[in-house]
Amino acid sequence: MASTTVAQLAGELNRSAAALLEQLQAAGVQKATPEDVITESDKTRLLDYLKRAHGSAEDGARKKITLTKRETSEIRQADATGKTRTVQVEVRKKRVLMKRDEAGAAPAEAEAPAPVTAPVVDVEEVARREEEQRRQAELLARQEAELKARQEAMEREEAERRARQEAAEAEQRRQAELAAKKAEEEAAAARAAAEASDEAPRRKAEEDAARLASEREAAQKAAEEARAAADKIKAEEDGARKRREAAEAEARAIREMMNAPARVLKTPAERKAEEKKAEQSGTLHKPVKAAGEARPAPAAKKAAAPAAAPAATPAGDKKGGRGGKPGGWQDDARGNKRGGLKTRGDTGGGVDGWRGSKGGRNRHGDDNRNAFQAPTEPVVREVHVPETISVAELAHKMAVKAAEVIKQMMKLGQMVTINQVLDQETAMIVVEEMGHQAVAAKLDDPEALLVEGVQEQQNVEAEARPPVVTVMGHVDHGKTSLLDYIRRAKVAAGEAGGITQHIGAYHVETPRGVITFLDTPGHEAFTAMRARGAKATDIVILVVAADDGVMPQTKEAIAHAKAAGVPIVVAINKIDKPEANPDRVKQELVSESVIPEEYGGDSPFVPVSAKTGQGIENLLENVLLQAEVLELKAPINAAAKGLVVEAQLDKGKGPIATVLVQSGTLKRGDVVLAGTAYGRVRAMLDENGKPAKEAGPSIPVEIQGLSEVPGAGEEVIVLPDERKAREIALFRQGKFRDVKLARQQAAKLETMLEQMSEGEVKTLPLIIKADVQGSQEALVHALNKLSTGEVRVQVVHGAVGGISESDVNLATASKAVIIGFNTRADAGARKLAEHQGIDIRYYNIIYDAVDEVKAAMSGMLSPEKKEETTGLVEVRQVFHVPKVGAVAGCMVLDGVVKRSSLVRVLRENVVIFSGELESLKRFKDDVKEVKQGFECGLSIKNFNDVKEGDQLEIYEITEVARTL
């Protein structure tokens, strides 16, 4: 027969060889490695061990049989309406027959040969009973051990107490003996001294006597203290004796409990049957009697208030009804003869009575006798109000109900709900009105983490950086052309309409250093762009055309530069033109507080020509000179910080932001945060579109990889990890949304009555999509300025990127016109717009977009009605015609009278009636018009009080189209 190894047996059993080796060791089979051979005897020993460990095969034999019996019957039952219906009743009975142990059954048969029916008990019930008996045995063993330990502790305590008592008694006896001996010695010495010297002064004798008396008192006091100590020891002995007796009583109770017969456990079915029987044996009117004697009344069981229970009514007293039964219901203690409310026990109106005291269910009577009384003075709380807060949260902070806050808001003229969000200003007004102190609170702002990075950058050594120069000026004054000459590029030639509509960032390397230029638009709509350019700049080049002079946007650029506190270098452009007048430009700039250096000011004036290049070198030299004076420095080896100059959405690349690095070094792979946008820099391009690995201070770059298009002008910060950037971005989004909603709600509530009083204002809904963020902002701003009291521009949605199907769907829902500025709609959007009839307009010059929207708004204006006098008629004679009324015979003094004209009746140059002509005749013929110098007959509708000498003024009302 082939031999079997440990590893082979383990494979057959689907177990690991290590586990099988452990089981073999436990079974007493010594095997060390998986290659050892196992014999049949080893397998038998292992099998016996496993049977002993997990139960033998005999345990698996069938020991019980379950019999299930099902009976179906019908009963007739009346329902709530009184109708009788048949109900099917199914009774299921389950019996479990257990196989008895043969070894234990033989003696039972010998003792009791008669067949005895064993109770049928479920196996689970048997197991539960055994478990309960085991727990009781463990509890008794534990209690006996605790009792034994307590007895030993008490015996030790008793021995220690006896030792202490004996020591105290010995000490007491010794002290008493010493005191008595000392007193006798001193008394003997005193007597000897008195006998030896009779001449000693009496005073000394008295002192000795007093001293002896004090010593005697001290001895007496010591004896009393000894007695007190003995009494204390005796009291401790009594306490120990009482504790010992209590422990013995407890032990005796435990022994009695152990010797008592075990309580027979009953199955759940038996317990339910007994409970049902007990419920049926007694009712509310028929109390239960057991073994011929009545059950005691529930009121008698309460020992807490025995005096409250009324006296039992005698059995023969008929006034008490069934008073012969102690557990029965009794009449009221006052003895209501007419059979009033039957009560049981105490009917007093006390706190503990089941009736309760006088005052109904809301009584508080004596319960609040010692309750805390709230202070009557108002509590003034310091309420910290965040930027946005709901009405419920504000009420919670003031510890008042939300209804009180809503009432206060209604008094202030605002209808709010409990979940409505209030802005900080409104909430602080409400808090002050309700008598509390409002404090503007700072939120748990995760942006506080950014302060640490700023402090770290301050510790880094700063190095010199290139200047950032912004070119500003009026439209068509040659800003971009000037930059083109400096950069040796031709940007202006490719711009739509010959005007700049984007903010551009470039850096130029000159022999004296690097200069970064920001080119801003000059059109009035691009105010926000110019403000951003002034914010990020160090020096402003103000370009003024020598033939045009100072214009509105020139003044605005001066204001931006002064607000930013940056120096101005004036470039007087187009000096090559014959009509150039630089002196007039200087005088106009002096009136705007821009003083040239030659007049004692601090602004250098440089005449230049972007066409010929005249003065360009002098301009750059002045710019670099100003930069040296400013001593521009920034840390280089630090996390980058910058400004979003422009942002756009590319269909393939996603959000793209033009960032001007202000400090530190921006590298590819950095995690950046810009407003509510965040992300890792996936790609970085310079202004020429070439990839760049890093960008230092004052260098503009385009970055890709942001989560969304950031707002132009947002600050860009490099953070250590993306998780923190996401947390801050989400916090800013929620904060921006809450503040925006709160302000919109406040604006709606404030303007609701105004809108109702003004009537319906016509609106022109628009959806604006632009190529870059700045253009979109400028277009929205320019179009909103066109709104009037009658026609209003409503920008439903403004965003960056191409026109998509979602934009067309939004336009369909809001009935809006889509404007695409330097962007186009995709194929799906064009098809959907054609199907829905949505108008999509494309523009690449901001003038054209503004002019067309202005024309559309003019068409929406209601036409103006204009009155024009066409003739004057004098009444010469009046004829009264039956069924027609008064007919006036008239002479046309001036103009023409038409059949469809309106008429005013003038009597002594006072208008007495205005109406229209009913008929116009010349002789007997109806005519359409009568010219000057001819007579005619006419009648006026609904007016017969025409007199000779009246004058009739003939006029017409024409509608004239209005324009904005």
Swiss-Prot record:
Region (G3): 519-522
Basic and acidic residues composition-biased segments: 150-185, 199-255, 268-279
Annotated TM spans: none
Keyword Nucleotide-binding: yes
Lineage, opening ranks: Bacteria, Pseudomonadati, Pseudomonadota, Betaproteobacteria, Burkholderiales
Record key words, sorted: Cytoplasm, GTP-binding, Initiation factor, Nucleotide-binding, Protein biosynthesis
Keyword set includes Transferase: no
Region named G4: 573-576
Residue span(s) of domain tr-type G: 464-633
Family designation: Belongs to the TRAFAC class translation factor GTPase superfamily. Classic translation factor GTPase family. IF-2 subfamily.
Region feature (G2): 498-502
HAMAP family to which the protein is assigned, alphabetical: IF_2_B
Protein species of origin: Ralstonia nicotianae (strain ATCC BAA-1114 / GMI1000)
Gene Ontology MF term list: GTP binding; GTPase activity; translation initiation factor activity
Domain of life: Bacteria
Protein name: Translation initiation factor IF-2
Annotated region (G5), positions in chain: 609-611
